[in-house]
Amino acid sequence: NRSADFIQGVDEDESDNRFINRGRLLHTLFSAIETEKDIDNAIDQLIFEGIIGKPETEDEIRELTRHAFSIPQVQDWYSGDWQLFNECDIIWQEKGELRTRRPDRVMMRDNEIVVVDFKFGKQNKKYNKQVQGYMQLLTRMGYPKENIKGYLWYVEEDLIEKV
């Protein structure tokens, strides 16, 4: 994290974890956005908190976010027309132990349920299993399987993959 790097005297550009840190920053940002109207406030909040520090980083993130939200499917997801469950835990019991999973974004509209997990790195098949797991948990909660759709949104690759 930026604070730890600062204390250790590691420049942000030299940090071995800069790609991980960037992914976490973007994940935090996208989790804070409920509708498209929230983008500027969410970025401003991260600047205020010192998570986004450099003006060029701010400009890059604003541009990446604007571009990501230009995709029609994303515009629908962030339109405000959905009942939203953002970063909400799904809790269940397995072999006598409580377990939790936290999808990035679950949306409901009419009889449709959409699970979206956003990723800021390269495609990986393990992510498909992760979203399938979220979908199975929603089925166990009583939602009809045929009403549940899952997606992986590889933000920086401009790719939405149906699971």
Q: Which role does the model predict for each range below?
A:
Residues 35, 85, 135, 142, ...:
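Amphipathic alpha-helical interaction segments
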Residues 103, 109, 113-149:
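Basic, amphipathic alpha-helical patches used to engage nucleic acids or provide basic targeting signals
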Residues 143-163:
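Substrate-binding beta-hairpin/strand module that engages nucleic acids
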